[in-house]
Swiss-Prot record:
Coiled coil: none annotated. The keyword Transcription applies. InterPro entries: Znf_C2H2_sf, Znf_C2H2_type. This is Zinc finger protein sdc-1. It is found in: Nucleus; Chromosome. GO terms for biological process: cell differentiation; dosage compensation by hypoactivation of X chromosome; negative regulation of gene expression; negative regulation of transcription by RNA polymerase II; regulation of transcription by RNA polymerase II; sex determination; sex differentiation. GO terms for molecular function: DNA-binding transcription factor activity, RNA polymerase II-specific; sequence-specific DNA binding; zinc ion binding. It comes from Caenorhabditis elegans. SMART domains: ZnF_C2H2. Residues 1167-1176 have a biased composition (Basic and acidic residues).
Amino acid sequence: MSDEEDIDESFEIEEDGISITDARGNSLKAQQIAGKERNLDPEADDLEVVVNFYEAGDGTFQLQLPKLTAVKPVDKVNDVLDFINFDKKVCDGIHSSIKLVSQRDQTGPAPFPKHKLTCAHCDWSFDNVMKLVRHRGVHKNVGVYMCQVCLTLFGHTYNLFMHWRTSCSQTSTTATDIEIQKAETPYLHRNVLNVLGSLNRASQYYCTGGYVFLPSDWCITNKEIVMEKDHMSSCHLCHLPVPNKFLEAHGNVHRGRFRIDGRIYGDYFCHICGTVFIEQDNLFKHWRLHCEEVIAYTPVDQYLSNTELATLAWLVLQTTISQADIECLRVSSSLITEKLAKEHAERHGIANSMHKYYHFPQEIWPLKTFVNLDLVNDAIPISGENSFKIKDPKRPVHIMNLLATACPGFYATGKTFNMICSTKKSESDTKKVYRVILRYTTEGSVIQSYDFTARSFPKLRVDSETPEGVFSHPLADFNVESNEAIVCHKCDSKKLTITFSTEVRLKYHLLRHSESRKDGYHCAICKIIVYNRSHEEHWINDCIPLQKLYRDQKDRECFDAEFAAKCASIIKKLRIRTLIRWKERANEDWVETKQTPDRIGEDFAIKFQVGTTALKTLMAGLEEHYKNAQARHEAYKYSEENFLPPLSTPVVVCFHCGTRCHYTLLHDHLDYCHYWPRNKRLVNEEFHKWKKNGCRNTWRVMKSVAEAMQIEVPFISEEQYSKILDYHTYFCNDTRYKVQDSINNWNDCSTIRDVDLSEKLSVAEIVQKGEDSVMAPEPDIIKNVYFPSARIITDNMLLRMTEINLNDVVQRDPITKEELTGKFKEVQDEQDAILFGDYRAVLRSKGIMVNSISDFVAPPDELAKAKASQESAGQESVDHRNRREREFIQQYMGKDLALEAAARENGRLVEVDEEAEDYELTPKELNARRLVERNRHREMCKTRCEHGEYDYEKFKARQVPINPAKMKERKYLTRVVHESGPDDDVCPDEPENNIIAFSPKYENSLSDFRISAIGFREKYLADDKKKRNGIPIRKMTEAQKGVALDYDTLMARHGGRPDVIMNPAGTVFVGGFVFDRKPTCQDNMQTVYVLRNGYAHRYRIYHCEDTNGIYKFVWPQEQSFDPDSLAKSARVRMVKQVKSPEHMIHHIEEIDESIGHNYRLNRKRRNSETREHELIELDTDDLNEPSTSDGRYSFGHHGYR
């Protein structure tokens, strides 16, 4: 019904003499309520409104209420309510009992039988560590429960109840033993009160229920009070278990009528996690250091004052209220009234229909009421006796529901009402109207006392109405919390429903629940039992040996489980003793034993007994492990500090609900509170699929909702939101936080390697003799350096052998045309897949119509056509070439076969296409041709097996003809050169010498790489089986440590044995590591050391001639590879060191001239003669091998590419 609808004219009530105005405020007359005169123009902080109830003609009940104008909250309010001086309300007999307690011996005789764990301070014994640790609180006097009958103290209520059942002389004799042992706790309380009544002491202790909690001085200043579950109820708004005496104040904190840091009955209560403190400073310290929810919303870059922290805590408390409960909160429902109303509804059997109406108006209990009715069990009758009671199933409406509907919202007007006055119903009233006066006031509001600033970020929420077509789910699913509470069944031993509003709260609760029941463990270094604390905290703060080794606490911040295990292992090998002496046992000396559970709580001293030599050895052995621990710690800090831009704040605001949190926790907040629908069953596959997508479209959806509903929400930028999700994905995929899978073989898990060419490819075209050769500008190949392009390798980019989909073609060697088998074919297929991709899809889209590298080699028919077009070159050069080739054939196949082959084409030997229709080779002729090609290739590759300086001229002899039809594809390969072989004693004008050969860069990236990688893996596996001991790690020099690689780290980082690669610039690529040269390191870069099982195995590195030591670079090989956290590329470093491009080119020339042309090609299996020149492990006698005199390092072939 409209608020502006007219009601009856003004009338008078004879008994009270109260004059009531109409709804419009017309004809206001002076009123007097309970002898108090009211002004015609009430002040803003005090207002009385008349509520009219009447029954309409159709039998429904209606209510009229005039509108209230919005009132601004007062500037200063008093936040001290009637929650103080609780101790004055307790009987004076408690204080007299405390005096008597100090004269009693509280430990008592030890129980029988004797258990294995004995207390260090008394004769009590226990059968497990948890009971012993709990018993220690008795000696500390942390706070005890006193029996009011015999004044005996107990540490826990359970022990007090057992005392009442068994040993209390007064209570145990009031009934039989069986009755007392089976009695419930309420019966025990009543039994104690009866005993106290018989002793004329019942009136003194009735308010405490038979026992008193006595906190000690230490407990008052340092410890929070733990409340028993028997005296707690769950808040219906945030579902927090709240002690009954704090329940009403907790509800007022929700409604903004009591400060969250206010004092309640002498205590300070954390309304977020339910912890009680004696001092306010401890409450603020708790919010800063221990309360998980407040810490999650606290900025890490700012220090909040106590006022700001209290504001932030209150806002965090408000985020625990669901959207539906906010509507109820606007009428400031009473928690105690809710509890009683639920019990009332259960008694009348209508508990399932309570959701149909508002249950609890604001401040009904314990406000002053002048209605003279029980607002809980009875109802105000309207138009008939008991016609408005809640137990009537046909009219499930209570008077409090109408009051709740009538009361204006506190957040809308700034007012609440604090008094209900009723007028007596007149018998002459025929319209069946009943009137109630509600007295509104702003007294008690503390909203303005909070410090709402940008630092405290008030929480904003979207409205409950959802625009059509935006969401497929109700907006309630995207709210902060679900409307239904989550029940914890683990701690509900007494069937007390402990509920939580969010999964995050339940998670923290279960974590604390499990930790409180976790047994102690021994520290492997100091042998002391560490109870209920993390390993890292103990190693950093309390471990005595580590404090002696690393005195500065900052040096111990990087300690982790891996470092502690290494430290304990080295201490054990060196036989360093850690001795313990128990101060309270004078007859015992220093002993080398672990602390036993029976000595928990005893004072002790630790002696770390180590000699000077052993100490130096220990520190030397820990040096490498300490550096690794520091590197792991710094890498973790670097990834957190440098992921977001430096100017951006790490604190972000959730665009759904306005929640303020650290950016690393935003994704978890979205997980638990917004994205995944609560009413949908959680399926692992769907959940991981959803999480993999990152929900990046949610930002746009929520922004459209805010714009459509005109809500001012502090949105973060879309770019920053994407960065946060990227960081969360990187953080979750970090290999340091995952268990490594089984190690795969090198060929089973390929890695994509991008080659970024600095210049485009230029080639020389083949022209006929007598014409000018047209050549593109071709600089010396030695000046060109390629740099691997670092990028993140994801699962989608990795190519495995099982996923490569190429045509089933026979893979042949590009030069000899021999069919490749075994591992060489696998490497060829893999490199083809990496270079050309899937032939059916990727190749056509990129314009590369090839299947493998072999397609770039000219087939015999194309070569024959090219040669036939050049017959005018001259008979003299033809005779010369034919004479050379006949000598080759005669050397291996005999003179007759050579002459016969020469006579086939008018005295000219040519290569014949096997598929040509006009000519067919006999088997002998075919074998002769193949043998000639095989022998020619063998002659060209002989230089790979030789030691010493590399002869660039010999490399030019390896001439590879390029298929003219594939010339347009050359830009996807690498640089090629146009040269003649040095061993060709031919005429300079002969056109046959103008053939194109593959460049050293091409051969290095595609040929030598696969051969050296396979060779490295075979040799490494072979050396692994020998298990030969190398150099002890502690005997390694600084230079040797500079080129050392830990074997376990290699396995953990890469999931398998890595390959070792070297590029033409001398950069060593070792398994995806940045191999930087240190300024203090005098390493000659001839070797690399692999650390395993305490020894360093030395391996020789070939073709590593970076004499200037300018740069080293990484070849990305990890899935979670982060290019920002690695060193800059070689190109960037080089540009920073030179002033101009000309200087840079000159600088590169100087580097490359010192390197030499150390490029080889070997696609065949190496025979037994060359196997000894592969990657070899050196003995310890070869450690002092001097470098070459000119400072350059020339080795054999098969360098690490």
